[in-house]
Amino acid sequence: MSIATTFGTANTSGTIKAMLLGCGELGKEVAIELQRYGIEVIGVDRYPNAPAMQIAHRFHVINMLDAKALKAVIELEKPDLVIPEIEAIATQTLVELEQQGLHVVPTANAAKLTMDREGIRRLAAETLAIPTSKYFFCDTLAEFEQAVTDIGIPCVVKPVMSSSGKGQSVIKSTQTIQQAWAYAQEGGRAGKGRVIVEAFIPFDYEITLLTISAVNGIHFCDPIGHRQEDGDYRESWQPQSMSAEVLHKAQAMSQRVVEALGGYGLFGVELFIRGDEVYFSEVSPRPHDTGLVTLISQDLSEFALHVRAILGLPISNIVQHGPSASAVILAEGTSTNIRYQGMAAALAPADTQLRLFGKPDIDGRRRLGVALARDNSVEQAVEKAKTVASHIKVLF
């Protein structure tokens, strides 16, 4: 990959242009960090006024699964960097354009492999022989029912391509098998299709290990613990307490996956921990939602680290500020005029912060912001973050 040695100014002929494919809350923070280096940011997403579009220099609204539309917008803008921030992208187009010289972050192959759960699971389990849960991929209800029989109950069901827990469920009895299939078909980002059935690992806890591949080597953030509900994270905290031996195993496993994917950038590696055993779950070649806690827990957030790495800049050290937590601000309703109250009360306690994402609308349940807190212990930080979040009243 080519590394920039000269940085220009946005909206001038000498600028470095970065195109964000996906303009949600994570993309918004990446855009902010890019602009700190004078990078010209072009946002692309499937709906207008997405969070990162609100601060990008300009934006385009397209269906990013449409290969023709994706190629057209890239050829129009001629970006120096293309930064996928979501999975639902025509990644084969990125692979083809990369072969013609386009710089995709971290690589087009990484984006393609992690676009769905099948590519990355087969890489980890079959190519790298990394421990994972037992799994089957299914295209039909008959295959699905056979997979559930072979794996046993309880088992976990997910669309091969989805995000934020959409379409995910745990089968706990034979009565819910068809319901789980139907829910997975509804929740896929690219519509109905293939699902993965996984054995349920009775893990002690799960972590996100933010792993950065930079010009000066591999770097790790302290492990992040998190609590899931309905397949989506509700709170995350850093550091997650774990033994030095298990942490070393987790880091070694994460490094193998990241190096196999290639390129520079930050990767969110999800792992299950049971006793002294570590199991690979998933990886995203970009900042991770549970890593929002790093906005308050570290001197360099996951977004700052991602941008440093993709620009070819070195990472010298990462300072962790102590027990920290995030708690999501979740709302349910229908509105195109979302407003908020309770900000003053929310931010009254010491060592607290708030991020409202700027989502333009809501139709159902949606994550609209995140509360951040530091305290003397992880447990106290989690409770403080939850209290901060509880003060925010969403008006529709």
Swiss-Prot record:
Pathway: Purine metabolism; IMP biosynthesis via de novo pathway; N(2)-formyl-N(1)-(5-phospho-D-ribosyl)glycinamide from N(1)-(5-phospho-D-ribosyl)glycinamide (formate route): step 1/1. ATP binds at residues 117, 158, 163-168, 198-201, 206. Its EC number is 6.3.1.21. Mg(2+) binds at residues 270, 282. PROSITE patterns: ATP_GRASP. N(1)-(5-phospho-beta-D-ribosyl)glycinamide binds at residues 25-26, 85, 289, 359, 366-367. Keywords: ATP-binding, Ligase, Magnesium, Metal-binding, Nucleotide-binding, Purine biosynthesis. It holds the Pfam family RS_preATP-grasp-like. It catalyses: N(1)-(5-phospho-beta-D-ribosyl)glycinamide + formate + ATP = N(2)-formyl-N(1)-(5-phospho-beta-D-ribosyl)glycinamide + ADP + phosphate + H(+). The keyword Nucleotide-binding applies. Gene3D superfamilies: 3.40.50.20, ATP-grasp fold, A domain (3.30.1490.20), ATP-grasp fold, B domain (3.30.470.20). It comes from the Bacteria. Coiled coil: none annotated. GO terms for biological process: 'de novo' IMP biosynthetic process. GO terms for molecular function: ATP binding; magnesium ion binding; phosphoribosylglycinamide formyltransferase 2 activity; phosphoribosylglycinamide formyltransferase activity. Residues 122-311 form the ATP-grasp domain. InterPro entries: ATP-grasp (IPR011761), ATP-grasp_carboxylate-amine (IPR003135), ATP_grasp_subdomain_1 (IPR013815), PreATP-grasp_dom_sf (IPR016185), PurT (IPR005862), PurT/PurK_preATP-grasp (IPR054350), PurT_C (IPR048740), Rudment_hybrid_motif (IPR011054). GO terms for cellular component: cytosol. Homodimer. Involved in the de novo purine biosynthesis. Catalyzes the transfer of formate to 5-phospho-ribosyl-glycinamide (GAR), producing 5-phospho-ribosyl-N-formylglycinamide (FGAR). Formate is provided by PurU via hydrolysis of 10-formyl-tetrahydrofolate. Belongs to the PurK/PurT family. This is Formate-dependent phosphoribosylglycinamide formyltransferase. The gene is purT.
